[in-house]
Structures are given as C-alpha cells and as structure tokens.
Design a protein with these regions (language model features):
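A helix-coil-helix interface module used to build multimeric assemblies
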Residues: 2-210, 215-222
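Acidic, glycine-rich loop-and-beta core segments that form the ion-binding/anion-interacting portion
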Residues: 224-275
C-alpha cells in the first residue's frame, strides 16, 4: 500500500498519501534514460551558465553547480552512481537529487530556475541521437572507402550476374560491390539530412511558451553543439518527428545491409564459392 507522500519527489506536494508502488514503477524511466546522463549534465551546465550570465545565479553558485554536476558525471562514468528506486523517476531527477547531496539543496535547487523538464528531455534526446548518428556516419564513411578501394583493386574480377538466382550476364565483381556502394552512399546522404533536423536546440522553449527571463538561447545552442534553434516553443517541446525519422532511416539502412549480407552468404556457400 502507498504510505506518506515522499519529500524527495519533485512533484506531488499536494497529495495526501504516497503514490501506489505500481504507479511508481510504471512511471519510472530512469533505467532507460540513464543513457542520457552525460547529455543531461552538459545541458544543465549550459543552462546554469546562461542563468549566471542573466544574473539569476552568482559566480559562486554557478561554480558550485558546475563542480557538482561534473562530480555526478564521474560517478556515472565509474559506475558508482546509486539510483534511488521510487525517487529517481528519470535521469533529470536523479542527477539533480545527487547534485543536491553534493553541494547542498539551497544552491542545487536554483539549477532548474526557468527550465522545464519538457525542454530538458527534448535536449537530451536530440544530443544523444546526434552523437549516435555521428558514430554511424563515421562507420558508413569507412565502409564506403573499403568498398571503393576493393572495387578498384579487383576491377578485373568477373562473376555471373544473377536474376532470381539464375545466371543471366557476366559482370565485374566491382560492379556488384558498387551497386551496394551506391545504396550505402544514398544512406549516408539521407543520414546527413536527418541529422540536420535532429541537431536543432529546443533549450529555452520552457514547458510550452518560452522562457520568461530572456535567456540567451543562441549561446546555449552553441555551447551544446547545435546548428540552430527551434524557433516555435510549442513545437520544440512537443516534436518527436526526429526520432521517428531516424528510425525510418535506420530501417532503410538495415534493409540494404540485409540484402548485402544475404548475397555474401549465398556467394560463400559451396554451390557458389565466390567468397
């Protein structure tokens, strides 16, 4: 049964009783979004710096928040961070709870001034996804270089070209490889287009209607590596198209990889013995 309301939660102050454990477990996302710990901390440091520049935080308060957040990040990196079940419902509350334990709640409590978790989670997701796409882009570029190099080195190799697994015409081995090279090059081009829409900053959008303190959104976006801003605050916090678009792009990439792998599996069989 639910007990008394938790004094450690960020919300529920008007509740007369504690939250049902089933609801607590259902509502927690910390075991998924803890993957965003670094992005969340970097976003919080950028936010605190912008608040300091507006005079909302003084130099000492900002220095303490930055120091504390970097200590929290080291705990995550070293595997020493301890999640509090029932309290740390997501990565944002976990990081801020631990920050308060390190530097004291009086200063830590000022970190979130003017910021909504709506924009915070959107920033974390976009930064994390951008970094994953950067990694995939690097792998794809290396892969394409190998395809191009092997195609040039092995240009004189000839093989049967197949339709429905029936021999049709003689082709160069490099022609087969470059058919996939073109598909992966198109995937690379599409990835870069997707990344342009991912890499837009919603920080400063507030819960839905912007920031009341005139915080410098451009400075925060530059610090966090965003290309531009999302200028409509409601769109900034509500949009998840960039996630769906990335998944759509990933589906096409995996389709091409599957076709390529299937050909290689067939060509490496005893019946074909090309590979």
């Amino acid at each position: 049964m639910a007990g008394a309301p938790s004094s450690e939660k960020l919300w529920g102050g008007r509740f007369t009783g504690g939250q049902d454990p089933l609801m607590t477990a259902y509502n927690e996302s910390i075991y998924y979004d803890r993957a965003f710990y670094s992005q969340d901390i970097r976003g919080s440091i950028a936010w605190a710096r912008a608040n300091k520049n507006k005079g909302i935080l003084n130099d000492h308060e900002f220095a303490e928040i930055e120091r504390g957040l970097k200590e929290v990040e080291e705990e995550w990196k070293s595997g020493k961070f301890s999640i509090k079940p029932g309290v740390d419902e997501d990565i944002h509350t976990a990081n801020e709870r631990r920050l308060g334990e390190i530097i004291g709640k009086n200063i830590a409590g000022k970190l979130h001034t003017g910021r909504s978790r709506n924009e915070q989670v959107a920033v974390d997701m976009r930064m994390w996804l951008r970094e994953q796409l950067d990694n995939i882009e690097s792998f794809l570029v290396d892969f394409l270089k190998v395809i191009a190099s092997r195609s040039e080195q092995e240009i004189e190799h000839v093989m049967p070209g197949y339709t429905h697994l029936q021999r049709a015409q003689p082709i160069r081995w490099s022609h087969w490889m470059l058919s996939y090279g073109l598909a992966f090059a198109n995937d690379l081009e599409r990835l870069r287009e997707v990344k342009q829409r991912v890499n837009r900053s919603p920080l400063g959008c507030g819960a839905l209607a912007g920031n009341p303190f005139g915080i410098d959104r451009d400075a925060m976006a530059n610090e966090l590596g965003f290309d531009t801003l999302i200028y409509n605050s409601m769109a900034g916090v509500a949009d998840r198209d960039f996630v769906v678009e990335t998944m759509q792009w990933g589906s096409m990439l995996m389709l091409h990889l599957s076709r390529w792998a299937e050909d290689l599996i067939i060509y490496s069989s005893a019946e074909f013995n090309f590979v």
